[in-house]
Amino acid sequence: MTDFSPREIVSELDRYIVGQNDAKRAVAIALRNRWRRLKLEGAMREEVLPKNILMIGPTGCGKTEIARRLAKLANAPFLKVEATKFTEVGYVGRDVEQIIRDLVETAIVMVKAEKRKSLEAKAHQSVEERLLDALVGANAAQTTRDSFRKKLRDGDLEDKEIEIELAQATGNLPMFDLPNMPGAAVGAISIGDIFAKSLGRSTKRRRSTVKEAREPLLAEESEKLMDQEQIIAQAIHSVENNGIVFLDEIDKICAREGRGGADVSREGVQRDLLPLIEGTSVATKHGTIKTDHILFIASGAFHVAKPSDLLPELQGRLPIRVELLPLNEEDFRRILTETEVSLIKQYEALLATEGVNLVFTPEAVSSLAKVAVQVNSSVENIGARRLQTVMERVLDEVSYTAPDRSGQTITIDAAYVEKNIGDLAKNTDLSRFIL
């Protein structure tokens, strides 16, 4: 769990997202409160529940980007899901409890990655021994092994071809749920697990170079050193205390007045979410997960529906409400220039691989921002995503001819932007910009 202060979290988010300070502050405080709760003792720790968040704002204003950056920052089990992917229990499709099962799998991957780092040195020793066995045989004299060990460490044998034996992977075999028992204690059963347990792990011999063999051998040796039960227990503890779920497109499951049909299932999804957000126990194949202390952050554009169209009980379970503002021309200009990996920096880096030096003048940046705002106001407003469409249009010719212009410096100024796109922005027919 990250120990960043709210100010540091907001500062980190500022590197990638322009504006939306209210939303940044809300998620920063929520994340810090997770850390504060873990410092409490006994009964008080159990009583402090997370304050779930509802983010409301037009498309392309930064809701999903906040979630993406928060996931990297949190250092905790984090899952982003679209609410539209789920159906009411009894309908064909995934039920909402699958969110928690997926969160557990995410946590297991995280814990394994941490363990792998701590076991790396020990695993490397085992890999070295297995590579020596493949090179000189298990019964070779010690002097021969020592001689080859030195060559191996010096990197002289990296391209030598050897034959190694690896455990057969079973993870890609199909999985299924028990009939009539969604979320049963065993959850999804893997056919691969059944065969592995009944027949034992099968192995497969394969030929590869020493360099290529290192990675799969390291993964296998690390896996052998891990205590799987301890990893699962640690992952479950991490999910129950630090887990964060980001529910995107929550507005798409609102049941609107005067509408029937599919709205029945939408309202059912909301009802299924209620106990999950309030706190319940979800059975997974790794054990039972209590959701009381999992933080839920919901977001939606609410173009057609209103937040009040959500079930009152669900509104009550999302007590912190944050409104994100639509982006203006100045915001677009800052997005193009000030963010850590802005679109301009991305295009400059991409074309630099062809030996082309791309330069944008400040006037060109202002012109790009202005065109994006004009197009957004004329057709559907898709926020900052419009910049990608505009940039692609402006740099279409440069991207196409870049291999023939190696060593050149290409300056993009306001006149160049106007020439490639200005007349289209003034035209009422803007169909080519609609994504």
UniProtKB/Swiss-Prot annotation:
GO BP annotation list: protein unfolding; proteolysis involved in protein catabolic process
GO CC list: HslUV protease complex
Broad class of the protein's primary localization: cytoplasm
SMART domains per record: AAA (SM00382), ClpB_D2-small (SM01086)
Amino-acid positions noted as binding ATP in the UniProt annotation, renumbered to this chain: V18, G60, C61, G62, K63, T64, E65, D248, E313, R385
UniProt GO molecular function: ATP binding; ATP hydrolysis activity; peptidase activity; proteasome-activating activity
Keyword Cytoplasm: yes
Domain of life: Bacteria
Subcellular location: Cytoplasm
Matches recorded under SUPFAM superfamilies: P-loop containing nucleoside triphosphate hydrolases
CDD domains in the record: RecA-like_HslU (cd19498)
Pfam families, per the entry: AAA, AAA_2
Function noted in UniProt: ATPase subunit of a proteasome-like degradation complex; this subunit has chaperone activity. The binding of ATP and its subsequent hydrolysis by HslU are essential for unfolding of protein substrates subsequently hydrolyzed by HslV. HslU recognizes the N-terminal part of its protein substrates and unfolds these before they are guided to HslV for hydrolysis.
Protein family: Belongs to the ClpX chaperone family. HslU subfamily.
Name of the protein described by the UniProt record: ATP-dependent protease ATPase subunit HslU
Organism: Beijerinckia indica subsp. indica (strain ATCC 9039 / DSM 1715 / NCIMB 8712)
Gene behind the chain: hslU
